[in-house]
Amino acid sequence: LHVRGFTQDVSSGVKNKGTFAGIREKIPYLKELGINAVEMMPIFEFDEMGSYRNYEGRQLYDYWGYNTVCFFAPNTSYESDHEHHHEGRELKQLVRELHEHGIEVILDVVFNHTAEGNEMGPYFSFKGIDNNIYYMLTPDGKYYNFSGCGNVLNCNQPIVQQFILDCLRYWVTEYRIDGF
């Protein structure tokens, strides 16, 4: 389930289109279908402008969310309430209400690459912390690109393994996510 895509069209009939709140409005519909679990496509904060371009006069942004900027934060553009310090509140409420209706929540989590891209990409986090530890690099310092997205996290490193475990644990304990 794509948070924005599920309710962004007027035909969804929701007030809060393209948001966590919009999905909450659709819980009766999900129950009517007999749904007992939803898998949300990436919901972490991502760089929507990372692949910004124009196509036939239309502005296109990164839609899917696979170029994560912060693995510990829900995407703020998926929230209808943009008041400061309310970040994450709508997602927590959505998960709680889905659980109340017997629907489990699974997240599509992609750790194999980030929004930092290759050596030409921006510095958001890992590059600035310890590029040689967090990313797999060729002997000449370029990024391995097994994913086709410009970089690959170096899961051979204990600190990267710990980061992944900490991240998954955070989503389970803080947001009550059921699986990945």
Regions found by a protein language model. Name each.
Residues 22:
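Active-site beta-loop-alpha junctions of metal-dependent nucleic acid enzymes
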